[in-house]
A protein has these predicted regions:
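Catalytic alpha/beta active-site cores
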Residues: 1-230, 248-251, 255-262, 296-303
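Short acidic (Asp/Glu) and glycine-rich catalytic loops that position anionic groups and cofactors
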Residues: 10, 57-60, 87-88, 130-132, ...
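Glycine-rich anion/phosphate-binding loop at the beta-strand->alpha-helix junction
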Residues: 189-192, 220-222, 227-312, 316-320
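Short, glycine-/Ser/Thr-/acidic-enriched flexible segments
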Residues: 20-22, 47-49, 99, 130, ...
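Conserved, mostly hydrophobic/aromatic
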Residues: 38, 74, 115, 241, ...
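Flexible, glycine-rich loop/tail regions that form catalytic "lids" or insertion modules at the edges
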Residues: 313-314, 318-325, 329-456
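Short beta-alpha connecting loops at secondary-structure transitions
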Residues: 62-67, 92, 131-141, 176-178, ...
Length: 456
């Protein structure tokens, strides 16, 4: 039923597109265009050298500069990236992990130059280095020191940037690495426990302020095309997070126990054959995180239809943004309370996922927690096993992927009529230009001041 007169219509979620490539200047122009089209938050993609802490002129950065994200090497790059963008009003998500503390420092410094009050800045640093050992691999330090860095960022933001989300605990990448719904929920919760235990045990936050730390934990989740199961998974996340916050950490304020999450729907499930089918996949996956009022995402970014082919163009990202806007502003979805309350089917699946996740959480905690389970190889082995099983089901035709293992006969797609022009391409001269720029920056900086700062 619609909301009673004393309840407000739900507000639209923050709408983002994951974007950035070539250079800070190029990406700044892209962000401005996206904001002008009605995007309500920014999601910054960094290139691999930036993610792993290499300058663009390092030999290991060769061929990767500006390719899958924007290169940021110093504060001048960050200034260029946010030139003309009102940082005090922006809600910026930065997908950065091993070097999160450094990128956050640059962002905060530039925001201060803009005149922004750091205590009012809104946004997120992903900062989940633990999942890098299980999926992406862009780590720079061993697990335990990485957890210490995460802890320091959490403590700093809670004290100095209280509206900032210091970590996005990522189940997203776990699913793409093979996780079942139970594993995805369990391992994300284990990571959250490891982070919160580390902050508590560090002694840097008073016991009276610890509930505020718990309240700033946020999650970044995945949603695949099995959208009913995915919706149930998110309801299970909410139940388990409530239990952990209340029972393990003694948080009494219900607002600080809310499962706060953003989402990008499943990119790995998008297909290169018949890529036009990705449009309906993306829409169905978006429903998983928006249909249920009690488990609705507060920030959504959708991949473009052609992401399996390469870097999407600005128009492709606009199409993904318009999907969100049509759902939020044209339909009546936000007029209603939760559509699934009382559903026996939903409640049974939620209970099944939650029970399985509780058992797996207990198993990991019995090993010594998330760090121990990463160092022993347990978590990785479980994900590899699940991924292998998933691949077998696809190869055997048990799991149907339209256009890949069934319904493969097709007419030529007009969306691909332009061939290579169907995707964005990075100018091959970009890397040389970025390298030249950082060398000029080094030559022009005050080396004595740099040395003094390093000594201090």
């Amino acid at each position: 039923m619609p909301y009673p007169s004393d309840r407000e219509r739900d507000r639209p979620w923050v709408m983002r597109t994951y974007a950035g490539h070539s250079s800070a200047t190029t990406s700044n122009a892209l962000y401005r265009r996206n904001l002008a089209k009605g995007q309500t938050g920014l999601s910054v993609a960094f290139d691999l050298p930036t993610q792993t802490g290499y300058d663009p002129d390092h030999e290991l950065a060769r061929g990767e500069v500006g390719k899958v994200g924007v290169p940021i090497s110093h504060i001048g790059d960050m200034r260029a990236l946010f030139d003309g963008i009102p940082m005090a009003q922006a809600n910026t998500s930065m997908t950065i992990n091993a070097t999160a503390m450094w990128l956050l420092a640059l962002y905060a410094s530039v925001a201060a130059e803009h005149g922004a009050d750091l205590a009012q800045l809104s946004g997120t640093t992903q900062n989940d280095i633990i999942k890098e050992y299980l999926s992406r691999g862009t780590y720079a330090f061993p697990p335990a020191p990485s957890l210490r860095l995460i802890t320091d960022v959490v403590v700093y933001t809670v004290k100095c940037m209280p509206k900032w989300n210091p970590i996005n605990i990522c189940s997203y990448h776990l699913q793409e690495a093979g996780a079942t719904p139970v594993q995805e929920v369990a391992y994300a919760m284990c990571t959250a426990i490891a982070v919160l235990d580390s902050v508590r045990d560090s002694g840097q936050v008073a016991a009276t302020d610890f509930a505020a730390v718990v309240g700033r934990m946020s999650f970044f989740v995945n949603a695949g095309v099995r959208f009913v199961e995915e919706m149930c998974k998110l309801r299970a996340c909410g139940q388990l997070w409530e239990e952990i916050c209340r029972d393990r950490y003694g948080v009494t304020d219900p607002k600080l126990r809310r499962f706060r999450y953003g989402v990008q729907v499943n990119s790995l499930g998008l297909t290169e054959p018949q890529p036009e089918n990705n449009v309906q996949r993306i829409v169905l996956e978006m429903l998983a995180v928006t249909l249920s009022r009690d488990a609705r995402a507060r920030a959504v970014q959708l991949p473009a239809w052609n992401e399996a082919l390469g870097l999407p163009r600005s128009w492709d990202q606009q199409w993904a943004l318009r999907m969100q806007q049509v759902l939020a502003y044209e339909t009546d979805l936000l007029d209603y309370e939760d559509l699934f309350d009382g559903s026996r089917v939903v409640e049974a699946r939620v209970a099944e996922i939650a029970a399985g996740a509780r058992a797996e959480i207990d198993r990991v905690q019995g090993m010594g927690g998330a760090i121990a389970a990463v160092e022993s190889g347990y978590m990785k082995a479980q994900l590899v096993s699940s991924l292998a099983a998933r691949r077998r089901r696809i190869e055997d035709g048990e799991d149907v992927v339209v256009g890949v293992n069934r319904f493969t006969e097709t007419d030529p797609s007009p969306l691909q009529a332009d061939g290579a022009a169907t995707i964005e391409t990075v100018d091959p001269d970009t890397e040389a230009q970025v390298i030249e720029a950082i060398r000029a920056w080094r030559a022009g900086r005050d080396s004595a001041a740099v040395d003094q700062a390093l000594r201090e």
